[in-house]
Amino acid sequence: MKMAVLVRTDLDMGKGKIAAQVAHAAVSLVLEIVQKRSKAEWKEWLEMWINQGQPKIVLKVKNLDELLEKYNKALQSGLPATIIQDAGKTQIEPGTITCAGIGPGPEEMIDNITGDLKLL
Protein backbone atom coordinates (compact mmCIF):
# COMPACT_ATOMS: atom_id res chain seq x y z
CA MET A 1 0.00 0.00 0.00
CA LYS A 2 1.11 3.54 -0.66
CA MET A 3 0.00 7.04 -1.48
CA ALA A 4 1.48 9.19 -4.25
CA VAL A 5 1.35 12.96 -4.48
CA LEU A 6 2.12 14.54 -7.86
CA VAL A 7 3.49 18.09 -7.79
CA ARG A 8 3.59 20.47 -10.76
CA THR A 9 7.12 21.68 -11.48
CA ASP A 10 6.03 24.41 -13.89
CA LEU A 11 4.77 26.56 -11.01
CA ASP A 12 7.14 28.79 -9.06
CA MET A 13 6.45 27.34 -5.61
CA GLY A 14 8.92 27.52 -2.76
CA LYS A 15 9.79 24.49 -0.65
CA GLY A 16 7.40 25.46 2.13
CA LYS A 17 4.56 25.99 -0.34
CA ILE A 18 5.19 22.59 -1.91
CA ALA A 19 5.23 20.94 1.52
CA ALA A 20 1.89 22.55 2.40
CA GLN A 21 0.30 21.48 -0.90
CA VAL A 22 1.52 17.89 -0.46
CA ALA A 23 0.07 17.86 3.07
CA HIS A 24 -3.26 19.16 1.73
CA ALA A 25 -3.36 16.30 -0.78
CA ALA A 26 -2.58 13.61 1.80
CA VAL A 27 -5.13 14.90 4.30
CA SER A 28 -7.78 15.39 1.59
CA LEU A 29 -7.45 11.79 0.41
CA VAL A 30 -7.87 10.40 3.91
CA LEU A 31 -10.81 12.70 4.70
CA GLU A 32 -12.55 11.76 1.47
CA ILE A 33 -12.38 8.07 2.37
CA VAL A 34 -13.38 8.57 6.01
CA GLN A 35 -16.09 11.22 5.64
CA LYS A 36 -17.75 10.44 2.31
CA ARG A 37 -19.55 7.43 0.98
CA SER A 38 -16.46 5.85 -0.46
CA LYS A 39 -16.00 2.33 -1.70
CA ALA A 40 -15.61 -0.33 1.00
CA GLU A 41 -12.40 -1.37 -0.76
CA TRP A 42 -10.95 2.13 -0.23
CA LYS A 43 -11.67 1.89 3.49
CA GLU A 44 -9.85 -1.46 3.62
CA TRP A 45 -6.91 0.04 1.72
CA LEU A 46 -6.83 3.00 4.12
CA GLU A 47 -6.68 0.71 7.14
CA MET A 48 -3.92 -1.41 5.58
CA TRP A 49 -1.98 1.73 4.60
CA ILE A 50 -2.21 3.10 8.15
CA ASN A 51 -1.06 -0.24 9.61
CA GLN A 52 1.92 -0.28 7.22
CA GLY A 53 3.18 3.12 8.41
CA GLN A 54 1.39 5.34 5.87
CA PRO A 55 4.01 5.18 3.09
CA LYS A 56 3.94 8.17 0.74
CA ILE A 57 5.90 9.17 -2.33
CA VAL A 58 6.12 12.66 -3.85
CA LEU A 59 6.65 12.82 -7.59
CA LYS A 60 7.16 15.51 -10.24
CA VAL A 61 4.84 16.25 -13.14
CA LYS A 62 5.82 18.73 -15.85
CA ASN A 63 2.57 20.64 -16.08
CA LEU A 64 -1.19 20.67 -15.57
CA ASP A 65 -1.84 18.40 -18.56
CA GLU A 66 0.40 15.64 -17.21
CA LEU A 67 -1.11 16.00 -13.73
CA LEU A 68 -4.67 15.71 -15.04
CA GLU A 69 -3.74 12.74 -17.23
CA LYS A 70 -2.40 10.83 -14.20
CA TYR A 71 -5.34 11.91 -12.03
CA ASN A 72 -7.86 10.68 -14.60
CA LYS A 73 -6.01 7.37 -15.02
CA ALA A 74 -6.15 6.88 -11.26
CA LEU A 75 -9.90 7.45 -11.20
CA GLN A 76 -10.41 5.12 -14.17
CA SER A 77 -8.36 2.46 -12.36
CA GLY A 78 -10.63 2.65 -9.31
CA LEU A 79 -8.14 4.40 -7.02
CA PRO A 80 -8.96 7.26 -4.67
CA ALA A 81 -7.68 10.52 -6.16
CA THR A 82 -7.93 14.22 -5.42
CA ILE A 83 -6.92 17.54 -6.96
CA ILE A 84 -5.60 20.41 -4.84
CA GLN A 85 -6.36 24.00 -5.84
CA ASP A 86 -4.48 26.79 -4.11
CA ALA A 87 -6.38 29.48 -2.20
CA GLY A 88 -4.05 32.10 -3.68
CA LYS A 89 -3.03 33.75 -0.42
CA THR A 90 0.73 33.67 -1.00
CA GLN A 91 2.68 32.56 -4.09
CA ILE A 92 0.11 31.22 -6.55
CA GLU A 93 -3.01 32.63 -8.22
CA PRO A 94 -6.31 31.59 -6.58
CA GLY A 95 -7.73 28.36 -8.01
CA THR A 96 -4.44 27.15 -9.49
CA ILE A 97 -4.20 23.35 -9.44
CA THR A 98 -0.91 22.62 -7.68
CA CYS A 99 -0.90 18.89 -7.10
CA ALA A 100 -2.87 15.66 -7.15
CA GLY A 101 -3.03 12.86 -4.63
CA ILE A 102 -3.54 9.20 -5.51
CA GLY A 103 -4.27 6.45 -3.01
CA PRO A 104 -3.81 5.01 -0.59
CA GLY A 105 -4.01 1.88 -2.64
CA PRO A 106 -2.09 -1.17 -3.80
CA GLU A 107 1.47 -0.25 -4.75
CA GLU A 108 1.23 -2.06 -8.09
CA MET A 109 -1.88 -0.10 -9.13
CA ILE A 110 -0.28 3.22 -8.26
CA ASP A 111 3.02 2.27 -9.93
CA ASN A 112 1.14 1.43 -13.15
CA ILE A 113 0.07 5.07 -13.29
CA THR A 114 3.06 6.88 -11.80
CA GLY A 115 5.98 4.56 -12.58
CA ASP A 116 7.38 6.87 -15.27
CA LEU A 117 7.60 9.89 -12.94
CA LYS A 118 10.69 11.07 -11.06
CA LEU A 119 10.94 11.77 -7.33
CA LEU A 120 10.57 15.40 -6.33
Swiss-Prot record:
A GO-annotated cellular component: cytosol
Subcellular location, principal: cytoplasm
Pfam families membership: PTH2 (PF01981)
EC number in record: 3.1.1.29
This protein's record includes keyword Cytoplasm: yes
CDD domains for the chain: PTH2
Protein name: Peptidyl-tRNA hydrolase
A GO biological-process term: translation
Source species taxonomy: Archaea, Thermoproteota, Thermoprotei, Sulfolobales, Sulfolobaceae
